[in-house]
């Protein structure tokens, strides 16, 4: 007597070939960009080891008792160590911001698989060279700044490439919700990077860079062998873009629900799939100026500049603010600061889901930004009154600050890169993503730098700066919000990408 078919096999049979490939692409790109963030994190962990409080340690026999810097790593042992360590952050962030504007242009013109895998391998090499400085006993500041600059440039290959790949495989149906979940790779990478770097920092801080460097390089090799750039390359059905969806609506006498899950593709017969696999014509790349002319690109780019300024100021300064203002020890402050990342994951999913349901990404971002300003004010004055208040406020601030940031850098970028004004004759995903994220990276470089200057006068000034940046981000979306409100009043479910 035969048993029934195994449950797992029945499940496998119920999943279409297209869905399997799409799920594989989601997991792959998630892991790839997790590696990018994983390899960025070590510098923030190692800083405490480069300059230490040597007075708390017993002096070796050959070290004078008056030498209070013997355990620090030159040239970071002097009183200006904060400026020197800050220069490492600035070197990375500025080179990343500049390189991002060119990364998209190269990404559109080079094979995506080669571009992403090569960038990951090169980034792994440059990250490892930071760690080699420990074993080679290098104490020259220029060495570390040089490889921070080179690594910043190499890291620009990641974001445009993974967003382009996601955009190639998935239509607009539930892109915001799926990408909101997918965008949690940032927090996952930060957490893993902290754990891996922290495991070696006290014994041999060089490994805090070398191990993450090996990991991202290894995944770069995996990317080279397994990444599929377009669904047509493996005979899968490509996602419908706006113009194609309109054509189908005109010719098929049945209702079409644009919010159907992105994993369900239009049925195609074997001959169509075979033909698509045999002969794939990919569209022509778009110019930098051409990408700027796409409606919404400039507004969302400038909005992200200020939104990312707020987000990265929290990223670099939140642990110190918690330690100073709430009198937590550094470890507890660091643990509490991760709640901001947890809120960011929730905010990204929430913003993406609302955007999918309403089709109004500009309004979604603006509402969250409007709520952010008073919440920052409240957190500054009342957020440290108790541990429960601190936890709640950190999660809420993470939701409101990182929600718009996540939505703009993922679903909005992908939507604009497949805008209907392109009429199918140009691809712009990588270039648009690079322009938007590059603009945001300018804010990411400015925010922590300004916070360092203003914090010496008091933390209130830092929060005033963050509130002002948040208001600017709101105002920059005013035109798109106005158009979306008009479309709502007209009874249309029309987003900025169709204006």
UniProtKB/Swiss-Prot annotation:
Q: Which UniProt keywords apply?
A: Antiport, Endoplasmic reticulum, Glycoprotein, Membrane, Sugar transport, Transmembrane, Transmembrane helix, Transport
A single GO molecular-function term is:
glucose 6-phosphate:phosphate antiporter activity
Q: Which domain of life is it from?
A: Eukaryota
Q: Name one GO biological process term.
A: glucose-6-phosphate transport
Location in or out of the cell: Endoplasmic reticulum membrane
A GO cellular component annotated for this chain's UniProt record is: endoplasmic reticulum membrane
Give the membrane topology, semicolon-separated if more than one: Multi-pass membrane protein
Glycosylated at which positions? 53, 62, 66
Give me the reactions it catalyses.
D-glucose 6-phosphate(in) + phosphate(out) = D-glucose 6-phosphate(out) + phosphate(in)
Q: What is its main location?
A: endoplasmic reticulum
Q: Which Pfam families does the UniProt record give?
A: MFS_1 (PF07690)
Q: Which CDD domains does its entry note?
A: MFS_SLC37A1_2
Against SUPFAM superfamilies, the record matches this protein to:
MFS general substrate transporter
UniProt-listed InterPro entries? MFS, MFS_dom, MFS_trans_sf, SLC37A1_2, Sugar_P_transporter
Name the residues that span the membrane.
Answer: 21-40, 86-106, 116-136, 143-163, 187-207, 208-228, 302-322, 334-354, 362-382, 391-411, 434-454, 458-478
Q: Which Gene3D superfamilies match?
A: MFS general substrate transporter like domains
| Functional note | Inorganic phosphate and glucose-6-phosphate antiporter. May transport cytoplasmic glucose-6-phosphate into the lumen of the endoplasmic reticulum and translocate inorganic phosphate into the opposite direction.
Describe the family membership recorded for this protein in Swiss-Prot or TrEMBL: Belongs to the major facilitator superfamily. Organophosphate:Pi antiporter (OPA) (TC 2.A.1.4) family.
User: What name does UniProt use for this protein?
Assistant: Glucose-6-phosphate exchanger SLC37A2
Task: Point out the gene that encodes the protein.
Answer: slc37a2
């Amino acid at each position: 007597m035969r048993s029934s078919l195994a449950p797992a096999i029945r499940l496998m049979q119920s999943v279409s070939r297209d869905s399997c490939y799409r799920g594989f692409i989601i997991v792959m790109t998630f892991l790839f960009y997790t590696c990018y963030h994983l390899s960025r994190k070590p510098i923030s962990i190692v800083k405490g080891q480069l300059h230490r409080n040597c007075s708390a340690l017993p002096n070796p026999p050959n070290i004078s008792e008056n030498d209070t810097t013997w355990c620090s790593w030159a040239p970071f042992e002097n009183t200006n160590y904060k400026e020197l360590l800050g220069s490492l952050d600035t070197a990375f962030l500025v080179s990343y911001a500049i390189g991002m504007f060119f990364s998209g242009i190269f990404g559109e013109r080079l094979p995506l698989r080669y571009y992403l895998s090569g960038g990951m391998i090169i980034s792994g090499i440059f990250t490892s060279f930071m760690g080699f400085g420990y074993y080679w006993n290098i104490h020259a500041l220029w060495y570390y700044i040089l490889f921070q600059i080179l690594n910043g440039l190499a890291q620009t290959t990641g974001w445009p490439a993974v967003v382009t790949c996601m955009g190639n495989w998935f239509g607009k149906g539930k892109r915001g919700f799926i990408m909101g979940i997918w965008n949690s790779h940032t927090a996952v990478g930060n957490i893993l990077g902290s754990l891996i770097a922290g495991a070696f920092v006290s014994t041999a801080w060089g490994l805090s860079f070398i191990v993450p460097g090996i990991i991202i390089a290894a995944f770069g090799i995996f990317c080279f062998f397994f990444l599929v750039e377009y669904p047509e390359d493996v005979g899968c059905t490509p996602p419908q873009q706006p113009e194609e969806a309109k054509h189908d609506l005109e010719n098929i006498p049945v209702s079409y629900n644009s919010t159907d899950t992105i994993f369900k593709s239009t049925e195609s017969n074997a001959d169509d799939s075979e033909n698509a696999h045999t002969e794939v014509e990919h569209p022509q790349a778009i110019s930098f100026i051409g990408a700027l002319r796409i409606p919404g690109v400039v507004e969302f780019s400038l909005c992200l500049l200020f939104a990312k300024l707020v987000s990265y100021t929290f990223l670099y300064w939140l642990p110190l603010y918690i330690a100073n203002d709430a009198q937590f020890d550094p470890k507890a402050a660091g643990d509490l600061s991760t709640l901001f990342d947890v809120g960011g994951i929730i905010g990204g999913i929430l913003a993406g889901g609302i955007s999918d349901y309403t089709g109004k990404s500009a309004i979604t971002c603006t509402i969250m930004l409007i709520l952010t300003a008073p919440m920052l004010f409240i957190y500054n004055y009342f957020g440290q009154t108790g541990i429960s208040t601190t936890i709640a406020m950190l999660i809420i601030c993470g939701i409101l600050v990182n929600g718009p940031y996540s939505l703009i850098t993922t679903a909005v970028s992908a939507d604009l890169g497949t805008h209907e004004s392109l009429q199918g004759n140009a691809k712009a995903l990588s270039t648009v993503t690079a322009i938007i994220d590059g603009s945001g990276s300018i804010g990411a470089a400015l925010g922590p730098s300004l916070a360092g200057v203003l914090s010496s006068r008091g933390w209130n000034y830092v929060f005033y700066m963050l509130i002002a940046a948040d208001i600017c981000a709101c105002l920059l979306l005013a035109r798109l919000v106005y158009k979306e409100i008009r479309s709502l009043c007209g009874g249309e479910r029309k987003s900025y990408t169709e204006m």
